[in-house]
Amino acid sequence: MQKEIYKRLIRVIPNLYSIKESGKSEASGFMDFHLDILQRKGDVLRIAISHYYKHPSGDMIPDPDMEITVNRKNETAEALTYQDTYGYQEVYSEDGSCNQSLQHSLNEFLLMWLNNLYEQGHKIE
């Protein structure tokens, strides 16, 4: 599944490794798609991708917002966190243990979301 996530991620962010800090895609009729590069360690990136909506207060709220680790050498990517209006979920606890059920669920969601982004015409370059 991690290789498929990587392939779909690169479809919507083909120049992922050359983007300095952030990027944004606008597709008519759909919410903007945002990218932030959080950390670089050689061939491994930690990124955040999100949609934002405008709250009645005027604040821009990310929903959803996911952090992902991307390994260029292995051509893999996996979900690390998920946040929306209802809460925050983390795959790995502070002691490094993995919630495998949550990991599977978030990776499935990420696959679907990346496919939807592509079908909506989103691309960050």
List each language-model region with its residue ranges:
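N-terminal secretory-pathway/extracellular module detecting exported/lumenal segments
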Residues: 1-63, 72-125
